[in-house]
Amino acid sequence: MGKMIYLDNAATTKTAPEVVEAMLPYFTEFYGNASTVYDFAANSKAAIAKGRQQIADVIGAKKEEIYFTAGGSESDNWALKATFEAYKNKGNHIITTKIEHHAILHTCEYLEKERGAKVTYLDVDENGFIDLDELQKAITPETILISVMAANNEIGTLEPLKEIGQIAHEHGILFHTDAVQAFGQIPINVDEFNIDMLSSSGHKINGPKGIGFLYIRKGVKIRSFVHGGAQERKRRAGTENVPGIVGYGLAAERANKSMKERTAKEIEIRDHMINRILTEIPYVRLNGDKVKRLPNNVNVSIQFIEGESLLLMLDNFGICASSGSACTSGSLDPSHVLLAIGLPHEKAHGSLRLTLSEEITKEDVDFVVEQIKAIVDRLRSMSCLLYTSDAADDL
């Protein structure tokens, strides 16, 4: 096997060398607990403050509105559970979508079963977009929160955050967005988009694992999620992960500075890959919108094959990809996202997600496409499905 070509950057990314270098002193040199009063802790306190500011700058927030967590899933749980508990006297209705990450969907299910919440799960169209008119119709006097992801982790669709936030605020409803995939990939301004809460995670932007944040707009009365000490202004207890915060702050700053140039390159390579796959492999459809999608996301459904078989054979060539989100790739169930956009089970099972990084070249993509073509031909020749033009449905 030659070099590895890593095309699963929606699952996680390689921590940038400069990020690792910045983190190291806070393991062995500046290791003081930031909650203590002696001078040795001053470096830790300063590092946390800097990381908080670096992240706030990316989304146009105030540094005191950034609360560090252990990752995107915790941030999503906090946003939904704590908001529900804080505002349940006003109402018990939450609006979200059928294509959210499981950190949102499973939290909503918990709130329904255990806390008496009523949740509306909005349908999406064939490209994964919500209907803003349907959102308006779903609002009731009991609605306290709208949670819609900024960018879908599987098909890359970019939801109309500004319009959603405007609708929410017109009705006096809080707006939360899961921006785990979008943060550092597309410009987001919390004031411009009327966002009250935003979740993100460090390891999606060449930062470390185990660190995330929840942006909470000043004035939002969200309750503490982890009880104990007085860290994070008494809203999230636990000794701060100083190395993680340092790394996350630098990764956020790095992603923001390189965003325009980096994403332009990713879009060029992404579109080249999409065009080759769609024109050179029959019975393939692109999942998600062709334009309003994450710069690095390619997701296709290939008829007459099983996606898991394709992944295993790609792995033999050193190509790392996914058939869906990493959180569900071990499951034989088809992606809930692909089912929500209208794909039947057999086509959802043939999905392939390829997510780029700044290190991926056009030559890498051309090599990958050639391997996909050869593997698809081989799998189709062995398929028990009738591979003829008469048997193929329109994708």
Describe the residue ranges of each PLM region.
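Pyridoxal 5′-phosphate
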Residues: M1-S389
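A short, hydrophobic C-terminal helix/tail in secreted or cell-surface proteins
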Residues: D390-L395
